[in-house]
Curated annotation (Swiss-Prot):
ISGylated. Interacts with RNF19A, RNF19B and RNF144B. Interacts with FLT3 (tyrosine phosphorylated). GO terms for molecular function: ATP binding; ISG15 transferase activity; ubiquitin binding; ubiquitin conjugating enzyme activity; ubiquitin-like protein transferase activity. It holds the Pfam family UQ_con. One of its GO terms (biological process) is ISG15-protein conjugation. The keyword S-adenosyl-L-methionine does not apply. The gene is Ube2l6. It catalyses: S-ubiquitinyl-[E1 ubiquitin-activating enzyme]-L-cysteine + [E2 ubiquitin-conjugating enzyme]-L-cysteine = [E1 ubiquitin-activating enzyme]-L-cysteine + S-ubiquitinyl-[E2 ubiquitin-conjugating enzyme]-L-cysteine. Belongs to the ubiquitin-conjugating enzyme family. This is Ubiquitin/ISG15-conjugating enzyme E2 L6.
Length: 153
């Protein structure tokens, strides 16, 4: 099965049973290997808004993992300033070809609520979360309110 066919099937399957933390799932008109959606975290401080997310599937998918990037700024130790997600499940060394997109999205939803302080990409945010959790939450809430997208009903 080609990457395009597998990704199209996964998109169709996921669209039929969209998890409560996702909205507006779609692919690029010209390229099914690029998905767009809104992530609606269920934990504070991120549940105050929604966040745009893009998934790029390589032509070698499922042999190579997809790339996840937030298109909405988010204050999080495992997400770079340009939105790239550091998620162990999609790292080259951990990726398994039988992993499905819905599993990746489930892992991302958990990561947003429970940051992985073992593998941060923004060390200063991981340090702040460790040393002063209340200050981290306050800054994350301010950032979320400033940059987040209104949650659809």
């Amino acid at each position: 099965m080609t990457a395009s066919k597998r990704v199209a099937k996964e998109l169709d399957d996921l669209s039929k049973e969209l998890p409560p933390y996702l909205r507006h799932l779609s692919s690029d008109d010209a390229n099914v290997l690029v998905w767009h959606m809104l992530l609606l975290p269920d934990q504070l401080p991120y549940r105050l808004k929604a966040f745009g997310l893009r998934i790029d599937f390589p032509r070698e998918y499922p042999l190579k993992p997809p790339t996840l990037r937030f298109t909405t700024k988010i204050y999080h130790p495992n997400i770079s300033e340009d939105g790239l997600v550091c998620l162990p499940l999609i790292s080259t060394e951990n990726w398994k070809p039988y992993t499905k997109a819905y599993q990746v999205l489930e892992a991302l939803n958990i990561l947003v609520s429970r940051p992985n302080l073992e593998e941060p990409v923004r060390l200063e945010l991981a340090d702040l979360l460790t040393q002063d959790p209340e200050m981290f939450r306050k800054k994350a809430e301010e950032f979320t309110l400033q940059y987040g997208v209104d949650r659809p009903s």
